[in-house]
C-alpha cells in the first residue's frame, strides 16, 4: 500500500484519501458491474392475468354450452355475446401468463419486464 497523498503546496499529508496499488492482472473491471440484479416479479399483474384467464375460460365454456344447447337459456342470441366476451377476456390473460411462464423458465427473449406492473 502506498503512503497517503501529500499536498504539494504545504507538504502536509492528506489523511482522508488512501491509495493502493492495483494488481498487475487487473484490467480495470470489477465483478459487480457485470452482475444482473434479480428480476422483480410483478405478482399483481400475474394474479390479474390468472383471473382474466380463468374468467375467460369459464365464459367460453358457458358460451359453448349455450350455443350447443346443453344449457337452454335463450340459445344463440345469448351464446354469441358470452363467447365474444369470453374470448376478449381470455386472450390477454393467456398472453401474459405465457410471458410469465417463459420468463420464469428463463427462455431467451422473455422477461418479467414485458408484463405491465401495477406498483404505482
UniProtKB/Swiss-Prot annotation:
Similarity comment: family membership: Belongs to the TMEM134/TMEM230 family.
Where is the major localization of this protein?
membrane
| UniProt function note | Involved in trafficking and recycling of synaptic vesicles.
Identify the coding gene.
TMEM230
User: What InterPro entries does this protein map onto?
Assistant: TMEM230, TMEM_230/134
A Gene Ontology CC term for this entry?
A: late endosome
Query: Phosphoserine modification sites?
Result: 15, 23-24
Pfam families linked: TMEM_230_134 (PF05915)
Where, per UniProt, does this protein localize?
Answer: Membrane; Golgi apparatus, trans-Golgi network; Cytoplasmic vesicle, Secretory vesicle, Synaptic vesicle; Early endosome
Q: How does it sit in the membrane?
A: Multi-pass membrane protein
Where are its TM segments located? 46-66, 79-99
Name of the molecule in the record = Transmembrane protein 230
GO biological process, any: synaptic vesicle transport
Q: Which domain of life is it from?
A: Eukaryota
Keywords, A to Z?
A: Cytoplasmic vesicle, Endosome, Golgi apparatus, Membrane, Phosphoprotein, Synapse, Transmembrane, Transmembrane helix
